[in-house]
Amino acid sequence: MDFREILMIASKGQGVNNVPKRYSLAVGPPKKDPKVKGVQSAAVQAFLKRKEEELRRKALEEKRRKEELVKKRIELKHDKKARAMAKRTKDNFHGYNGIPIEEKSKKRQATESHTSQGTDREYEMEEENEFLEYNHAESEQEYEEEQEPPKVESKPKVPLKSAPPPMNFTDLLRLAEKKQFEPVEIKVVKKSEERPMTAEELREREFLERKHRRKKLETDGKLPPTVSKKAPSQKESVGTKLSKGSGDRHPSSKGMPLPHAEKKSRPSMANEKHLALSSSKSMPGERIKAGSGNSSQPSLREGHDKPVFNGAGKPHSSTSSPSVPKTSASRTQKSAVEHKAKKSLSHPSHSRPGPMVTPHNKAKSPGVRQPGSSSSSAPGQPSTGVARPTVSSGPVPRRQNGSSSSGPERSISGSKKPTNDSNPSRRTVSGTCGPGQPASSSGGPGRPISGSVSSARPLGSSRGPGRPVSSPHELRRPVSGLGPPGRSVSGPGRSISGSIPAGRTVSNSVPGRPVSSLGPGQTVSSSGPTIKPKCTVVSETISSKNIISRSSNGQMNGMKPPLSGYRAAQGPQRLPFPTGYKRQREYEEEDDDDDEYDSEMEDFIEDEGEPQEEISKHIREIFGYDRKKYKDESDYALRYMESSWKEQQKEEAKSLRLGMQEDLEEMRREEEEMQRRRAKKLKRR
């Protein structure tokens, strides 16, 4: 084929290709689906029936499955209950010691199990029914709840007020002119700060609270105290009982009315130190005047268990030690008592030689309350009437001249710091004598005193068990040769043991600490701020365990005391304070220093009326734990002492952040160090 022919063929093909193929763009007629008119064919009907049946079957299956699940659930629930009950009873049998398990005969057991099975089945059925009903009710409720919202929506909607038309510019200007000089009120939204309060803020808040409380108390205090009316009758009964014939023994007036009275007076008198003065003045009619010289009168016969107040507000007990029948000692005592009385009040003491009760225990300086039962306030609360420590139940043998010595007696003296007193810290002395000791409230000079040498064992354990002397200040001893000023009373807080010639210490309690005696002849001044007249077994056992029975000069119980001059030289032996009480001690020393009412000390003894007191007292004695340690912490601080989970997480995050920062800094430092070293190495090269 030659070249020309090829070109010819190519040119022919070119012409054919030039005409493009085109599809018609005209829209054709619409295609209509042929619709079957009238009844559907049999095949279609059969198909539809089959579908419906399937749906119905599925629904039934679903229902059955649900019921089965519910049944299983109930069974499980029941099993769980039964298992838990079984476990509980099994476990608890350790606690039921002494309850015998009844052995049942096999027949009986079989019948019981049969009945129990029946009851179980019934129970299951009931529970199932209940559950189904409950489910039904629940689903109905849910359904109703679902249906209700649309009803709420279907209420005719109140058409929203259309926005006011926008103002003209001229109107706006006019309004601006008007409002230009009016002050704009900006509402300050207070942000409640979450940060904890600072110590100063806390102090301020506490101070305000205290003020408020004081005002309340003052308003309450204006109401006359009702309880103290019980006192005179009690005292009289004690007096008359003690003055009966010398042979009879009797239980001296049982302190039973005390607790009830205490309960009554507590609410009204809690924290009422500042009412001490007014209350003591308010009942002048109840003070029984003692006969001037008749120390054998019944009123003075009770004297052995009354603290003697020598007007300066310091009671000392009329308890005498049996082992010293010497007149010289009793004379020094008498002269000391007289000297004290002359100093403080114009009441002359008509006491005869021999340790006896001076009339001052009735006529005291105003504001000094006699501690004890008449006001029947909890020890540590101001007593209102004239009061004496009651002799708590126990047979009291009679002694010569009608003065009985109370063996297992407790004299509770509620001594709280009177505020405007001539002497801020009254020390109370428990007037108890050992079983063999007469408290000779009257006795001629040098009258021999019968009885064993089992003297009252002093245990001034007001600070901690085993400390011989409880008063935080030194106990000054009288020197028998020195005559009237044999008692060196230096300052308000000194205890006066001069009234006791024999050298048995009478435990002097710290202000606000009552003195109680437990057991025959054991004087235990209590360690807590409150003591109830009833003494529990626990306290007795504790006191007998922990306490070293020796008088304050360190001598043991049976030994004769050395001469008082020697005693003065030797000085009292004292154990160190347990650390738990340091804070309290500081408070008490502050108390001694200032005579005026101290607002800070207003709530010194706070938790008086609580039934916890006995328990906490024993806990304190055993463990040295003091609940009052956190007393001056505010409620706020105590509440937030334990942090919440959120706060803990915050702290964690904070510490983590700080830790990471520290790590980064350390790494940076290390890098810098490395660079420095490298630079040094390069320089050396």
Swiss-Prot record:
It comes from the Eukaryota. The keyword Kinase does not apply. Residues 317-330, 365-385, 402-415, 435-501, 542-553 have a biased composition (Low complexity). GO terms for molecular function: DNA binding; histone binding; histone chaperone activity; RNA polymerase I core binding. Residues 571-685 are annotated as: Important for interaction with histones. One of its GO terms (cellular component) is nucleoplasm. Residues 1-570 are annotated as: Important for interaction with DNA. Residues 101-111, 188-209, 260-275, 644-655, 666-676 have a biased composition (Basic and acidic residues). Its main location: nucleus. Residues 45-81, 123-148, 645-685 form a coiled coil. The modification Phosphoserine is found at S278, S471, S599. Signal peptide: none annotated. Residues 79-168, 188-615, 644-685 are annotated as: Disordered. It is found in: Nucleus, Nucleolus. Residues 587-613 have a biased composition (Acidic residues). The modification N6-acetyllysine is found at K582. Changing M641A: Strongly reduces affinity for histones. One of its GO terms (biological process) is nucleosome assembly. Keywords: Acetylation, Coiled coil, DNA-binding, Isopeptide bond, Nucleus, Phosphoprotein, Transcription, Transcription regulation, Ubl conjugation. Residues 416-431, 519-529 have a biased composition (Polar residues). Histone chaperone that stabilizes pre-existing histone tetramers and regulates replication-independent histone exchange on chromatin. Required for normal chromatin refolding in the coding region of transcribed genes, and for the suppression of spurious transcription. Binds DNA and histones and promotes nucleosome assembly (in vitro). Facilitates formation of tetrameric histone complexes containing histone H3 and H4. Modulates RNA polymerase 1-mediated transcription. Binds DNA, with a preference for branched DNA species, such as Y-form DNA and Holliday junction DNA. Belongs to the SPT2 family. Interacts with histones. Interacts with a heterotetrameric complex formed by histone H3 and H4, especially when the histone tetramer is not bound to DNA. Interacts with histone H3.3. The acidic C-terminal domain mediates interaction with histone H3/H4 complexes. The histone binding domain can functionally complement the yeast ortholog in regulating histone exchange and suppression of spurious transcription. This is Protein SPT2 homolog. It comes from Homo sapiens.
